[in-house]
């Protein structure tokens, strides 16, 4: 078993979700900026911080820098723990404590021992993409995620349209038949040719008024 093949993607909402980041270096700074931009409440604990943290603290109300020493009880206040220190002994201790408390944690120094991984993410109007590659190569993840976003943007209008259809047929007996019809290469072809309304009217005229 390994953490790459034995994993599943979960989209974590930033609304009312508190995250503790242990560390104040460049790695912690990158993770902090990513999480702040997604609306999470982020508290960072370290004896000292990279100077760029001060700029973040002035720009984000959902960021708090904590200079006090670490205590085990502190972990109870947070939904997710992110380990970003270069102290292997300390990191190992935090992993053990988190496991004993059934806390989800990300160890950026040992992703293979983490309960979660912070994937590269990108969003278009209607599609969110998360990407993880095997091993540690964050620049490759970001590069491929950017390419994926550009590709998926072409489907934004299609996704918006079929989601509207999906929400309008939830009480119909032939719902699954309709969903299989619109979620297909054939229907996508006609959508891209701007003939999707005509095709729906031909096969499912009752949907046009919706």
Predicted feature locations:
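Short beta-strand and adjoining strand-loop segment in the mid-core
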Residues: 39-43, 79-88, 127-136
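An accessory alpha-helical subdomain
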Residues: 133-210
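E1/E1-like adenylate-forming module used to activate ubiquitin-like modifiers
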Residues: 102-156
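ADP-ribose/adenylate-binding Rossmann-like module
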Residues: 80-86, 91-117
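NAD(P)-binding Rossmann-fold cofactor-contacting core
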Residues: 30, 38-56
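Glycine-rich, highly charged phosphate/nucleotide-binding loops
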Residues: 58-73
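Glycine-rich adenosine-cofactor-binding loop
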Residues: 8-33, 46, 161-176
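A short, basic/flexible loop-to-alpha-helix module at the beginning of a structural domain
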Residues: 1-14, 119
